[in-house]
UniProtKB/Swiss-Prot annotation:
GO molecular function per UniProt: ATP binding; ligase activity, forming carbon-nitrogen bonds; zinc ion binding
Gene name per UniProt: queC
Name of the protein in its database record: 7-cyano-7-deazaguanine synthase
InterPro entries according to UniProt: QueC, Rossmann-like_a/b/a_fold
Cofactor details (free text): Binds 1 zinc ion per subunit.
Organism encoding this protein: Xanthomonas campestris pv. campestris (strain ATCC 33913 / DSM 3586 / NCPPB 528 / LMG 568 / P 25)
Enzyme Commission (EC) number: 6.3.4.20
Length: 224
C-alpha cells in the first residue's frame, strides 16, 4: 500500500485530511508537533484522532518554538477574540514550513512519497503559509532538497482542503465518518480541551458547522 505522512494537529481540518488520504488508498503515518503551544489539549486530541482513524503510526516530535517567540500561540501575548486586518498575532513564524520539513524528513525514512497538510486558503485567517503559492513552493523545495526527490519517484505535497470552506470540510468529514467531537481547534482551550467559544478558531469552526447544517460537537468551557 502506498504511504503518506499527514500533519495532525488535533484540530478538525487535519482529522478530515487523514480521512481524505485514507479514502485515496494511503496508509497514513500521522505526525504531530509539540512546539510549545499554549495548551496540550490539541496534542491529546491528536492522539484520540490517530487512534480512532486507524493510522499506521503516530509520531510526536518536539520542536520548542517558544525559544523564538513572536506569536500569541507561543509567547505571552493575548489571543484576540475577533479577527482583524493583516496577519494575526496567532501566526507562528514559519510554522508550516518547519512542520512540513519535519514531515518531509519522516517521509524519507518510512518511504512515503506523499505529504498531506490541512492548510486552507478560504477560511485561513490571513496566514501566509496557508496560501496555494506556499504549498507549490514547498513541493519544489522537497524535490530539490531530498534524496527521495533527486533519486526516487519524487515527492508530492497535498492540501486537499485548500479551496474548501469550513462547511465543505465539515460535510467531507461527516461523509467519511470523522468524529469531530474528538478534535480541538480553540487557541485558548482549557486542560480538558473545552473551547473558549470566542477566538478566531472557535468562530470559524462554529460557523462551519452552522453553515453545513451539522450539529456542533464542540465542548465549550462557557456558553458561546
Amino acid at each position: 500500500m502506498k504511504k503518506a505522512v499527514v500533519l495532525l494537529s488535533g484540530g478538525m481540518d487535519s482529522a478530515a485530511v487523514i480521512a481524505l488520504a485514507q479514502e485515496q488508498g494511503f496508509a497514513v503515518h500521522a505526525l504531530s508537533v509539540r512546539y510549545g503551544q499554549r495548551h496540550t489539549s490539541e496534542l491529546d486530541a491528536a492522539a484520540r484522532v490517530a487512534a480512532a482513524q486507524g493510522v499506521v503510526a503516530h509520531k510526536v516530535v518536539d520542536v520548542d518554538l517558544r525559544s523564538i517567540g513572536g506569536s500569541a500561540l507561543t509567547a505571552d501575548i493575548d489571543v484576540p477574540e475577533a479577527g482583524g486586518a493583516g496577519i494575526p498575532v496567532t501566526y507562528v513564524p514559519a510554522r508550516n514550513t518547519i512542520m512540513l520539513s519535519l514531515a518531509l524528513g519522516w517521509a524519507e525514512v518510512v518511504g512515503a512519497n506523499d505529504l498531506f497538510c490541512g492548510v486552507n486558503a478560504v477560511d485561513y485567517s490571513g496566514y501566509p503559509d496557508c496560501r496555494p503559492e506556499f504549498v507549490r513552493a514547498f513541493e519544489v523545495l522537497a524535490n530539490l532538497a531530498t534524496k527521495a526527490g533527486v533519486e526516487g519517484a519524487g515527492l508530492r505535497v497535498h492540501a486537499p482542503l485548500q479551496f474548501l470552506s469550513k462547511a465543505d470540510i465539515v460535510r467531507a468529514g461527516v461523509r467519511l465518518g470523522v468524529d469531530f467531537g474528538l478534535t480541538v481547534s480553540c487557541y485558548n482551550a482549557d486542560a480538558d480541551g473545552r473551547a473558549c467559544g470566542h477566538c478566531d478558531a472557535c468562530r470559524l469552526r462554529a460557523a462551519g458547522f452552522a453553515d453545513a447544517g451539522v450539529p456542533d460537537p464542540t465542548h465549550y468551557a462557557i456558553s458561546s
